[in-house]
Amino acid sequence: MSIEIANIKKSFGRTQVLNDISLDIPSGQMVALLGPSGSGKTTLLRIIAGLEHQTSGHIRFHGTDVSRLHARDRKVGFVFQHYALFRHMTVFDNIAFGLTVLPRRERPNAAAIKAKVTKLLEMVQLAHLADRYPAQLSGGQKQRVALARALAVEPQILLLDEPFGALDAQVRKELRRWLRQLHEELKFTSVFVTHDQEEATEVADRVVVMSQGNIEQADAPDQVWREPATRFVLEFMGEVNRLQGTIRGGQFHVGAHRWPLGYTPAYQGPVDLFLRPWEVDISRRTSLDSPLPVQVLEASPKGHYTQLVVQPLGWYNEPLTVVMHGDDAPQRGERLFVGLQHARLYNGDERIETRDEELALAQSA
């Protein structure tokens, strides 16, 4: 079941929370709405569900306008962060609930309900807990019950509002993998809200990054990481180093050093330079690719790589976070050399395009 979000606007009083949002979600795709608090992601999810009404715009399911349909008529499954299970019902009865309250002409008979719930219990790996009550379950088990209950009525679309936000880190990882496997098996269309970048990129087919009621970027997870469309996405998606400098003529100046850009940009003046830790060239020896001296302040082994915090020596005041691969991890106090040639330049929110899309930073002049 495809979803078309067309020119959705939403205001609460004088506060505009969604600004002309448009997005197409193909049938069978799992989409993450990712953003900080106040970005509008949960409001958009609730509008898709019919739990909130847009100020203007349209929601279409597979070409049919459902904008004025009540939530119960949209055939949407909704999973909340805090489970919303019935405390007085067993696991089995919680999952069966949606089936038992269907209109009589749509309601399966008791045998069919039992068969479906039994199948769902096996699918969510909770068959052995069918007679337990919510108070006897862990957080991860409760969330599986909530998901099974949402799937019991065979929704055309599954919506999840920060489904793993209340769980500890290890349980979140396990449930993310499980949800992805379940999606691959059932091929339902799904939209989930999260503020966790790792969760969004691990589970979703497409990540929609939102900020202040706008869509900043909607792309495949690796594309959002590698080619952020805006400065907001660049800074929001994981750790990034920011250095302040200036473009003068055909050179980029940062601290006491400058490099030729290989051309003269139209913009001249202050700029911010951004590199993710793994985009910083780093070496134990000075070279054209890594000419700038730094000293290791912290070294944190991460398995196949070491994350370092390094202090520039004489050319910039703020420390940088970098990644160094290999088994021979640097020690605190060791002298290394870095290069910044894969940086992105911004003047405020405006990207400064560079030749070949990267800085041609050469050996310091």
UniProtKB/Swiss-Prot annotation:
Name the reaction it catalyses.
Answer: sulfate(out) + ATP + H2O = sulfate(in) + ADP + phosphate + H(+); thiosulfate(out) + ATP + H2O = thiosulfate(in) + ADP + phosphate + H(+)
- Where does the record place the ABC transporter domain? 3-237
The record's keywords, sorted A to Z, are: ATP-binding, Cell inner membrane, Cell membrane, Membrane, Nucleotide-binding, Sulfate transport, Translocase, Transport
The cellular location(s) given in this protein's UniProt record come to:
Cell inner membrane
Could you mention a single GO BP entry for this protein?
sulfate transmembrane transport
Among Pfam families, the record links this protein to: ABC_tran
CDD domains annotated for this entry? Answer: ABC_CysA_sulfate_importer
The answer, when asked if ATP-binding is one of the entry's keywords, is yes
Q: What InterPro entries does this protein map onto?
A: AAA+_ATPase (IPR003593), ABC_SmlMolc_Importer (IPR050093), ABC_transporter-like_ATP-bd (IPR003439), ABC_transporter-like_CS (IPR017871), Mo/tungstate-bd_C_term_dom (IPR008995), P-loop_NTPase (IPR027417), Sulph_transpt1 (IPR005666)
- Which GO CC terms are listed, alphabetically? ATP-binding cassette (ABC) transporter complex, transmembrane substrate-binding subunit-containing; membrane
Can you tell which superkingdom this protein's organism belongs to?
A: Bacteria
EC identifiers of the protein: 7.3.2.3
Assembly and partners are described as: The complex is composed of two ATP-binding proteins (CysA), two transmembrane proteins (CysT and CysW) and a solute-binding protein (CysP).
Q: What else is known?
A: CysPTWAM system can also transport molybdate.
**PANTHER family the record matches:** SPERMIDINE/PUTRESCINE IMPORT ATP-BINDING PROTEIN POTA, SPERMIDINE_PUTRESCINE IMPORT ATP-BINDING PROTEIN POTA
Family the UniProt entry places it in: Belongs to the ABC transporter superfamily. Sulfate/tungstate importer (TC 3.A.1.6) family.
Name of protein: Sulfate/thiosulfate import ATP-binding protein CysA
